[in-house]
Design a protein with these regions (language model features):
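Active-site regions of oxyanion-processing enzymes, predominantly non-cytosolic
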Residues: 188-198, 315
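Generic enzyme active-site microenvironment
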Residues: 97-98, 197-200, 246, 318-319, ...
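Carbohydrate-interacting/catalytic domains
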Residues: 1-56, 83, 87-89, 353, ...
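Conserved alpha/beta catalytic core and glycan-binding cleft of carbohydrate-active enzymes
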Residues: 107-143, 230, 234-416
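Acidic/aromatic-lined carbohydrate-recognition and catalytic surfaces
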Residues: 2-186, 190, 203-255, 259-263, ...
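Active-site rim elements
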Residues: 168-174, 327-341, 442-453
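Short loop/turn motifs at secondary-structure junctions
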Residues: 45, 65, 192-194, 318, ...
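Hydrophobic alpha-helical scaffolding
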Residues: 219-223, 287-294, 337, 448, ...
Length: 546
């Protein structure tokens, strides 16, 4: 078993198994592929690996549509493989976090199959079925496009799906549903996993089923019984363990996230929120093409840092995951090799000096970029394909639609991990399930490890700093120069220590503002700071005299 780790000082490495490492040649990553690369992950220095879902699934939403919570998808391997992964990871002092989806199941799940058999079936109340003679019961929108209700002709009723039509929402108001889910969570605890990431967990409590003058999310986001349900989940499953738990929170608030994570409330350890990753949306709409609103990014990051700190909660900090574009393409610059490397290092430093638990998404540590696909045929993500057809139907030109997908598609982060400059980036001996980014000859793990100045070693150093300096984990945060057009500046204070963080989000050199005391020891740096000027995409952390 791995050594005890203070989860607040821990760093998590997210693995998207389908795109990580294929050992069978079928073009799909697998569990044995993860085992094969554990030494690499250990070298990076993280404490946990988080696997996106590996359960049985028809894969309409790449595993987030679970048809059997207690079996491993054969594409990824076997239960024996998963057991071996946990054993080998623990031998290397790595903990394993499972992604679990308990807001909805696949429509291929046995519960849903039973529910469709008749209106009197006991599993009918596991889901939200409603009769309606006038079309869908409400005008709520699915997050994947279209109405959130699907007509089922088998029993002449509509069922709720906040996501894809193949993902039916579970009725948490039904105690039998909750107990069934708690048994599943306890099964995996007994199996030996060390933590859980709960998908869209703040949507589990639905309120009134009324028409909305918006898209309906006000009726189910942070719903009326959500804190009651999470407290019960905690008490009946992981609450008496040292497991790390994190909830993915959709369109939530600071106030609710404090409640979700205050230790005395006994709900979750920490939360993901995504407000800082909507700063390139136009009027809150994802499927638009927009530049980074830098002032808004700083404002949101600091609101959440201060709010969670003051409220005694705990937040995750991250730039990337399996649902987001690659940050170096999004907020940095991938147009040249020099700019890619420099901006990736700057973004890493800017984020990892914040309070919270850092999550590093596979490939982020080597500066992987968006793939810049040029055809809809290259996309695999159901949300992106739906958006493509929706935008075309609204009259947008195809070139404009592809440009939007190129900026916002979830497939940007789902291209295979680039291990080397060998065929297929060393990911597979077969045909990969999705195209590999064409820059793998320059951007790959092999090259990163050979160059001590690479992005990889910046991430490694940042992880080491978090493990060894309490100021990063426990210190207060003070924003500085929030009105500056290019610099992200903040201080960290803890006991008699004070650190100053300066990050230049511009490709050009920037003069440092007056009043910015910079005397002290350099903790970590990328780029240069000379003659009161910081280089393009430069960043520096200085331990100053408090």
């Amino acid at each position: 078993m791995s050594k005890e780790i203070d989860w607040r000082k821990s760093v998590v490495y997210q693995i998207y198994p389908k795109s990580f490492n294929d050992t069978t040649g079928n073009g799909i990553g697998d569990i044995n592929g993860i085992i094969e690369k554990l030494d690499y992950i250990k070298l990076l220095g993280v404490d946990y690996i988080w696997l996106t879902p590996v359960y049985e699934s028809p894969m309409n939403d790449n595993g987030y549509d679970i048809s059997n919570y207690l079996e491993i998808n054969e594409d990824f391997g076997t239960m024996d493989d998963f057991e071996k992964l946990i054993k080998v990871a623990h031998q290397k002092d790595l903990k394993v976090m499972l992604d679990i989806v308990i807001n909805h199941t696949s429509t291929e799940h046995e519960w849903f199959k039973e529910a469709r058999k008749s209106k009197d079936n006991p599993y009918r109340d596991y889901y939200f079925f409603r009769s309606s003679e006038d079309g869908p019961p409400t005008n709520w929108h699915s997050k994947f496009g279209g109405n959130a209700w699907k007509y089922d002709s088998e029993t002449d009723g509509y069922y709720l799906h906040l996501f894809d039509v193949s993902q039916a929402d579970l009725n948490w108001d039904n105690p039998e549903v909750r107990q069934s889910l708690y048994r599943i969570v306890n099964h995996w605890i007994d199996f030996g996993v060390d933590g859980f990431r709960f998908d869209v967990i703040n949507l589990i409590s639905k309120g009134e089923f009324k028409d909305s003058d918006k898209i309906g999310k006000e009726f189910y986001t942070d719903g009326p019984r959500v804190h009651e349900f999470l407290h019960e989940l905690n008490r009946q499953t992981f609450g008496n363990t040292d497991m790390m738990t994190i909830g993915e929170m959709s369109s939530t608030t600071i106030e609710n996230c404090i409640k979700y994570t205050q230790p005395e409330r006994q709900e979750l350890n920490s939360v993901f929120n995504f407000h800082h990753l909507k700063v390139d949306y136009v009027d809150g709409e994802k499927w638009t093409n927009a530049k980074l609103d830098f002032h808004k990014l700083k404002e949101i990051l600091m609101q959440w840092q201060r709010g969670i700190y003051d409220g005694g909660g705990w937040n995750a900090i991250f730039w990337c995951n399996h649902d987001q574009p690659r940050v170096v393409s999004r907020f940095g610059d991938d147009t040249s090799e020099e700019m890619r490397i420099q901006s990736a290092k700057m973004l890493a430093i800017a984020l990892h000096m914040l309070q919270g638990t850092p999550y590093i998404y596979q490939g982020e540590e080597i500066g992987m970029t968006d793939p810049h696909f040029t055809s809809i045929a290259q996309y695999r993500d159901v949300e992106s394909i739906n958006a493509y057809h929706q935008l075309l139907s609204e009259g947008h030109a195809e070139a404009d639609v592809l440009a939007i997908l190129g900026q916002k598609s979830r497939d940007n982060s789902r291209t295979p991990m680039q291990w080397s400059d060998d065929v297929n980036a060393g990911f597979t001996a077969g045909k990969p399930w999705i195209d590999i980014s064409e820059n793998y000859h320059q951007v790959n793990v092999r090259q990163a490890l050979q160059n001590k100045e690479s992005i990889f070693y910046t991430y490694q150093k940042l992880i080491q700093l978090r493990h060894t300096h309490d100021i990063i984990t426990y210190g207060d945060i003070v924003p500085r120069f929030m009105d500056h057009d290019h610099l992200f500046v903040y201080e960290r204070h803890y006991k008699n220590q004070q650190w100053l963080v300066i990050a230049n989000f511009s490709a050009s050199a920037v003069d440092l503002p007056e009043g910015l005391a910079r005397e002290g020891c350099v903790v970590i740096q990328t780029g240069t700071v000379e003659n009161n000027t910081i280089s393009g995409f430069g960043a520096i952390v200085i331990e100053t005299n408090a």
